[in-house]
Amino acid sequence: MKNFEKYIDWMYKRDEKKGEHTLKNIQKLLEAFDNPQDKIKVIHVAGTNGKGSTCNFLSNTLSKTSKVGLFISPFMECMTESITINGVKISEEDFVKYIEMFKPVLEKLDVEGYKNTYFEVLTAIMYKYFYDQKVDVAVVEVGMGGTLDSTNIVKKPIASVIVTISMDHVGILGNTIEEIAMNKAGIIKEGAPIFLYPKDEHLYKLFKGVADSKHAPLYTFSKDEVKVLETSDHENDFDFRNYKNMRTSLVGVHQFYNASLAIMVLDYFKEMFNLNEEIIKEGIFTSHNTGRLELISKSPKILVDGSHNKEAMDALVASLKVFKYKHLILVFSILKDKDYEYAIKELSKITDKFIITTIDNPERAFKLYDLEKEVKKVRDDVVAIADRVEAINYATTIAEADDLILVCGSLYLVRDVIKFVKNK
């Protein structure tokens, strides 16, 4: 659709704001549409790793009995993937209709000094679309942080969910784990229940303090309450509290806990959304999360994962133990504002062939030569191929039948590889 591509370009060209970031711009934008975000039920999900998986567990299960909006980022292939209802993307026609609806207001606000960024416009479209479509509930993933993320314009979600917290977006969200946690805690709202991934005592007290100050009941669980039954390269089996023989097709050791967090939320809302144990069991098992520890090809075996910070990298390395392979061939790239030294060091320990390539993000991506220098601090046998398609082609050429190709380091890289493999 011609207009769709034109408007996508128009959205991308809305430059990032200079100076202090506030919610004032999106507030002005949504006020012009009578604040649709405050007229729908919202489950708001923040955290460093596991947001996407947890959102998918929640939305997929709730959609068994209800009309459920899901907002996630980043998307893998097309911007419309960010806004879905019961798994169906907003159509290109509707997307264009909403941009044309918003455009005059945006242009007026631009002149008044309230310029909304691409992500703020996308967020505003999402809230208005979900309201117009009369969703029963919207599961909304925070873009970055919490306090000043554009999704946090919602005044009172029916629940706030916070997954794992680790050092990511340092300098933007904070320079310590406590500062980053406080930023995520910004989604805790007056009286709205908060569901928390297991935290150490120090961080738990921090979240409890914020929850108490907002009169928000806090629910969490101990990892000891999750009984691992079986792990494999295609499913995880576990018990969580009264929920026995649960299964998830999202693999990786961390998914036991993401799924348990989702189950805790779903159990709380059983009556509101007419759920029972069987529906929850089916919803958890049939959930999918593109680009996160996903086997996208069986011959040759290609595994993709968007891990780019310490905690996610540790989870990836631990999860690889359930995959059977002779040699591990790595296709890797990473943004220079991520913990690249740690990622290179840990991946180098387990990789037989280390191939590096580039990412389509000129401002934040490494130049190939600079990334090569970083890898060579750890190992000499690095293969540098600038073109991402050539890099994955080279990996498939050298891979034998029982080898595993791992593509990781950035969702930008994973996105391009998925697109290439699918088209091939």
Residue ranges of model-derived segments:
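Short functional linear segments
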Residues: M1-G47, T54-K64, L70-S73, E107-Y114
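ATP-dependent carboxylate-amine ligase catalytic core
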Residues: Q27-D38, K64-K155, L173
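Nucleotide phosphate-binding/pyrophosphate-handling subdomain across enzymes
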Residues: K39, D132, V137-V142, L148-V161, ...
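Beta-strand->loop->alpha-helix junctions that form or flank phosphate-binding loops
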Residues: L70-P74, Y197-P198, V210-S232, T248-V253, ...
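Extended acidic/charged loop-beta regions that coordinate divalent cations
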Residues: C78, L122-I172, K205-N245
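Membrane-proximal helix-turn-helix segments that form the acceptor-binding/catalytic region
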Residues: A181-E190
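C-terminal helical cap/extension that packs against the catalytic core
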Residues: D200-Y219, H234, K301-V304, K310, ...
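Active-site-proximal loop/hinge segments that shape catalytic or ion-binding/gating pockets
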Residues: S410
